[in-house]
Swiss-Prot record:
It is found in: Cytoplasm. The gene is PRT1. Residues 1-224 are annotated as: Sufficient for interaction with PIC8. GO terms for molecular function: identical protein binding; RNA binding; translation initiation factor activity; translation initiation factor binding. Component of the eukaryotic translation initiation factor 3 (eIF-3) complex. The keyword Cell division does not apply. This is Eukaryotic translation initiation factor 3 subunit B. PANTHER family: EUKARYOTIC TRANSLATION INITIATION FACTOR 3 EIF3 -RELATED, EUKARYOTIC TRANSLATION INITIATION FACTOR 3 SUBUNIT B. It comes from Candida albicans (strain SC5314 / ATCC MYA-2876). RNA-binding component of the eukaryotic translation initiation factor 3 (eIF-3) complex, which is involved in protein synthesis of a specialized repertoire of mRNAs and, together with other initiation factors, stimulates binding of mRNA and methionyl-tRNAi to the 40S ribosome. The eIF-3 complex specifically targets and initiates translation of a subset of mRNAs involved in cell proliferation. Its main location: cytoplasm. GO terms for cellular component: cytoplasmic stress granule; eukaryotic 43S preinitiation complex; eukaryotic 48S preinitiation complex; eukaryotic translation initiation factor 3 complex; eukaryotic translation initiation factor 3 complex, eIF3e; eukaryotic translation initiation factor 3 complex, eIF3m; fungal biofilm matrix; fungal-type cell wall. Belongs to the eIF-3 subunit B family. Signal peptide: none annotated. GO terms for biological process: formation of cytoplasmic translation initiation complex; translational initiation.
Amino acid sequence: MSINEEDYLQLEKEIKLDDIDFSDLEEKYEVNIGLDNYIIVDGAPIAPEAKVPVLIKVLRKLFSQVGEIVEGDEGIYMPLENGKSKGYLFIQFKSTESADLAIKKLHGKKLDQNHRLLVNKLSDMEKYGVDGAVNEEFIEPEIEPFQSHGYLKSWLQDEQGRDQMVLHFSETVGVYWNKKSADPEPVIEPRKGFTSKYAKFSPKGTYLFSIHPQGIQSWGGANFNSIKRFFHQQVRLVDFSPNEKFMVTLSPIPISLPDSTVDRAQFPFGPESEGHKLVIWNMITGEPVRTFALPPHLEGQKEMPWPLVKWSYDDKYCARQGPDALAIYETESNFQLLDKKLVKVDGIQDFEWAPAGVKLHNSKAVDGKHVLSYWTPESTNQTARVALMQIPSREILRTVNLFQVSDCKMHWQSNGKLLCVKVDRHTKSGKTIFSNLEFFKTNERDIPVEKLELKDVVVNFAWEPNTERFITISRLDDGNPNPAIPKNTISFYAPEVTKGGVNHNSKKKGGAAIAAAVAAAAINNQSSTKYKAYTKIENKHSNTIFWSPKGRYVVVATISRTSGELEFFDVSFDDETNKKSLPANVKLLKTDKFSGMTNISWDPSGRFVAAWSTSWLHAIENGYRLYEFTGNLLRDDSIDQFKDFVWRPRPPSLLTNSDKKKVRSNLREYSAQFEEADAMEADAAVKEIILARRKALEEWRKYRAKHISKQGNSKNEVQAEIIEEIKEEIIEEKEEIVE
């Protein structure tokens, strides 16, 4: 039956299409017009039409690594113009996820030396490429107002010259003033949840850092206000450059770029950092300046050697050790490799920068040269070697060949004049270990090396700051490792100069004269210097050495799970009964037992020593003790769940040598002032008496000045003034009981 047009139109009017459900058909025949699985790649090479198929093949192989590309010409389209490609192309992936991954992984990828690929979604190009989508009128960016954090070195202005310390107990962290035997005075209110792991000061004490799952937070100023945030998820280890310009962080979790474009814009890392775990930060801007992947041999290690990045004394260079090579970077050239290549050192085991500029013989450099030391083990056709290298020239200044070497440890003296290499050697049978000490004298011609051969194994070595004296702890390798038997020997070494150095028959006595003689020997660069153990203490459990930062005083301690002991020594003791003047005159000042002790630290002034037991290792006598440099116990504070004690470092003194000389000449006057201040702080009654006397004296001076001005300048009167000063001193006190 046929229907004419008129009837069809009438029927169409009668049928209500809105009542019919077409959803199944719409879903079945839906046309996908979305562009989310398309990307546009810019920065590709401009190639002749004949070479375009080869270029497409290369790019297809590259982008297929992140996802499946549609086959044929629909998968990759590269426009041509005048017989050449136009430098960009379109790629269609089979899924949106593959397109997102391509942008995340390959944006910024260097195809070769001259071409870097820029990858974006086609939908973004369409979004921003349409006329009017982007405002062409320049809008001045809003600059955030400067936010002052106060004076970052405000603690140095303390009138009493006190040092600050961090006490970490339970979940609370507090910063306190050291008040000797009295309760520490809080600088700010202690904060609960201040850090999720530990708190740490920068090397000069300017910043305090807290560790969090999201990264690191820096604090500073008088009230420890928030300064910068450094985003690095699950960071574990932190280190700093000596001058506080840079910070290094390490996380076990590799860096992963966010999927969201908005989040990626706020993310501090770019595609080149994908998968990296080690980050160097600029501490001023808070931005990452370089990231690194961990070397393959360190991946999966439970105990990570730290630091992985080591710095020159002035922050100008930093270096990383890799397999058979050193990577040295110039911080002033955006952390580019020195000369754009690695320093090849086959088998390198360890390296250390000189902690100060090395003034090489006949060098006119005021600040000294950058020098690092490294060692390599024995191989089939080569001996073990220790070498000194100058940077940036890479010149090898000195090399020493060593035989039958088990291990080496390099110890630079604080001013860079000496390097001691502790060489653990084995006998031909390999059953016995003993140590040699190799001393490199960097200031002398050709850098001579003095050798000190020992029969014992040196388990610890430490230089006295700024001198040639040092201490070793050693033991005889007799095959009996029983820790209950005290077998360690503490040896105090000093230079024995045989020609024009230390004068052993000097008429000047005392520690000051001895220290001056030792310093003179170092300055005179006597190549005939030998090192002699002036004092040995045998049969000890001692295993650690802690020199005062000012020298002369040292704590030799036993730190173990079962026992703890501190021994305080003066290595320049003024002994008037001893007529001999020696480079080292050692006196045991005090001994104290501290079971459960885990750590020891000197304050920056060298006046106080803190020892503590941390709950991070065990629950035995958690808390801390505070000692004077002579070993007198000032404070014993047991604190449940005590975790850490951190002194706040101080920057180097700004005083010139003439200023320091002036202070030393007026030391008695300053000592009297300090003793008065100590007496006031220790006893409230004494404080009231002293303040009352000061007030009375000030009133008398005002009264006297007032009446002298009234008398005028009379020539006929003889103006005489008698001032009586009475000093009371208690010589001796005795208490007698009268029955």
